[in-house]
């Protein structure tokens, strides 16, 4: 087969006309050094702070340092295959994570990739990991409670929806246990929970997930895990990723609860990244913006108004306010709350629950120090019945701790002081609670009522908890209607108070405890 010159030229013309050429203009640079997950890149002139960068082998990084002649970036994932001279491209995108109800019940990493072996997360939406917190105009005051089911917290340090309440204490004194009880108690309360594990052992995270599954809490919980074996970048990003996932529900008129366990590890990871990026160190070798690291995260937890939700959803959701409640955890060293990170987070949050190793070792669990634990806004959110009954408990405990210190040195105590000490011992005993056994509102109300009205005063201290349990069981079987009224109204009317008094007196006479 022979082609003449005219046919060849026609063929070439038709090929040229059919050619679709599109110019792919992308900013790219060259890797000049890789150390400890930090990459220095030359030639990336048009790059944003926090922009995703594409490395060879489908690996991504995050631009953090924008200098005159180079860019400092942190690698998200493995970096062993990246070497000097590799080409780096900009993506034009800020880091995003998947959001939506599809994530509920799943365990994901800091980038939203599933790590629970249950297949892909088919989330329809993604959202930026760094967002501006809602302004003052769009916020509402805290007025609805988050019931943790823990007697000492719900009575003395109440938490409201949209609040930031710090859980602070030394290692191994029950911080995670308090947070998990709060999640387990949200069953049937229309509250989505997000548990962010930062820098923990993989086995510890697995134990948490297993416990949440056993109690049925994974049905409304998302777990974001950046374990100790993950890179510092992943530990730094995990809280922001979890917060973005929680904001999805807040902005659509729903309520969410997020637990950061713990922010000390995030601060350590950020310090490591900053020092490797050659940023100037400050107090305790932390960078200058470590306060901003936590403030911009915790300010995103808020109760937003109906107008905000309506504007955000373009009128699809009306008349509903949303909230994101944050329970950050901070680990102290030898009870030192004056260290840099603890003082920062105490000043950002709306109160703190202070756990003490001495109380924990003395068998008072949860080991909450009632004297220094405080909730600055939660009182407005307390249920009526608990608010009525809890005032006396806090006073009794505070006076007991003060008197107990003096009583060690005094041999002859007057009757009033002795009475106060005895009451305090019983209240302290009453506030003990086993792990993973959160209480309902009526159960807390009954316990507080019994303590306030002196029904525990003539009991032996060792009998207090068995009396409380027996009383609850008795009310469940004989006074179900009274329980229902307290649960429905969240209040104790005059008639109900009379019925409760009679029930307690009858039970006490029976001696069935």
Swiss-Prot record:
GO cellular component annotations of the record: plasma membrane; proton-transporting ATP synthase complex
The entry's keywords: ATP synthesis, ATP-binding, Cell inner membrane, Cell membrane, CF(1), Hydrogen ion transport, Ion transport, Membrane, Nucleotide-binding, Translocase, Transport
Biological source species: Burkholderia cenocepacia (strain ATCC BAA-245 / DSM 16553 / LMG 16656 / NCTC 13227 / J2315 / CF5610) (Burkholderia cepacia (strain J2315))
Coiled coil segments of this chain: none
Complexes and interactors: F-type ATPases have 2 components, CF(1) - the catalytic core - and CF(0) - the membrane proton channel. CF(1) has five subunits: alpha(3), beta(3), gamma(1), delta(1), epsilon(1). CF(0) has three main subunits: a(1), b(2) and c(9-12). The alpha and beta chains form an alternating ring which encloses part of the gamma chain. CF(1) is attached to CF(0) by a central stalk formed by the gamma and epsilon chains, while a peripheral stalk is formed by the delta and b chains.
Site residues by UniProt (Required for activity): 373
Record bears the keyword Aminoacyl-tRNA synthetase: no
Protein name: ATP synthase subunit alpha
Binding site for ATP: 169-176
One Gene Ontology molecular-function label: proton-transporting ATP synthase activity, rotational mechanism
Role according to the record: Produces ATP from ADP in the presence of a proton gradient across the membrane. The alpha chain is a regulatory subunit.
Membrane topology, from the record: Peripheral membrane protein
Reactions listed under catalytic activity: ATP + H2O + 4 H(+)(in) = ADP + phosphate + 5 H(+)(out)
Keyword Metal-binding: no
The protein's Enzyme Commission number: 7.1.2.2
Family, per entry: Belongs to the ATPase alpha/beta chains family.
EC top class named in words: translocase
């Amino acid at each position: 087969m022979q082609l003449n010159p005219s046919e060849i030229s026609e063929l070439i013309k038709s090929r040229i006309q059919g050619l679709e050429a599109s110019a792919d203009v992308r900013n790219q640079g060259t890797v000049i050094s890789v150390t400890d997950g930090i990459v220095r890149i030359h030639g990336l002139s048009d790059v944003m702070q926090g922009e995703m960068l594409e490395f060879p082998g489908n690996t991504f990084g995050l631009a953090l340092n924008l200098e005159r002649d180079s860019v400092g970036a942190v690698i998200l994932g493995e970096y062993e295959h990246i070497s000097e001279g590799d080409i780096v491209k900009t993506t034009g995108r800020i880091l995003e994570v998947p959001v939506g109800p599809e994530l509920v019940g799943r365990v994901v990493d800091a980038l939203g990739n599933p790590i629970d072996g249950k297949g892909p997360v088919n989330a329809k939406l993604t959202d930026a990991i760094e967002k501006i917190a809602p302004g003052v105009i769009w916020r509402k005051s805290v007025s609805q409670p988050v019931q943790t089911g823990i007697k000492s917290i719900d009575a003395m340090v109440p938490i409201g929806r949209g609040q930031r309440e710090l859980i602070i204490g030394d290692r191994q004194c029950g911080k995670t246990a308090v947070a998990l009880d709060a999640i387990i108690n949200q069953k049937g309360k229309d509250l989505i929970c997000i548990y962010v594990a930062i820098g923990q052992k993989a086995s510890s995270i697995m134990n948490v997930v297993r416990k949440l599954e056993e109690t049925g809490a994974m049905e409304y919980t998302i777990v974001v895990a950046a374990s100790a074996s993950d890179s510092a970048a992943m530990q730094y990003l995990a809280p922001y990723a979890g917060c973005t996932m929680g904001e999805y529900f807040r902005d659509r008129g729903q309520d969410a609860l997020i637990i950061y366990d713990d922010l000390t590890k995030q601060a350590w990871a950020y310090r490591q990244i900053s020092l490797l990026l050659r940023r100037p160190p400050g107090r305790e070798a932390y960078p200058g913006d470590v306060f901003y690291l936590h403030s911009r995260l915790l300010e995103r937890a808020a109760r937003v108004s109906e107008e905000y939700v309506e504007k955000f959803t373009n009128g699809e959701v009306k008349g509903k306010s949303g909230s994101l409640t944050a329970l950050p955890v901070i680990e102290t060293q030898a009870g030192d709350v004056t260290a840099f990170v603890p003082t920062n987070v105490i000043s950002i949050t709306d109160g703190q629950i202070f756990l003490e190793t001495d109380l924990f070792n003395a068998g008072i669990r949860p080991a909450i120090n009632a004297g220094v634990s405080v909730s600055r806004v939660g009182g407005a959110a307390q249920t009526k019945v608990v608010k009525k009954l809890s005032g006396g408990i806090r006073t009794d405990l505070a006076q007991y701790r003060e008197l107990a210190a003096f009583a060690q040195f005094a041999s002859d105590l007057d009757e009033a002081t002795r009475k106060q000490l005895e009451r305090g011992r019983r209240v302290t005993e009453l506030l003990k609670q086993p792990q993973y056994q959160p209480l309902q509102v009526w159960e807390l109300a009954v316990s507080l009522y019994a303590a306030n009205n002196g029904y525990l005063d003539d009991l032996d201290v060792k009998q207090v908890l068995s009396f409380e349990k027996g009383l609850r069981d008795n009310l469940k079987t004989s006074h179900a209607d009274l329980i229902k009224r307290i649960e429905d109204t969240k209040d104790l009317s005059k008639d109900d108070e009379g019925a409760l008094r009679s029930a307690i007196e009858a039970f006490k006479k029976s001696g069935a405890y």
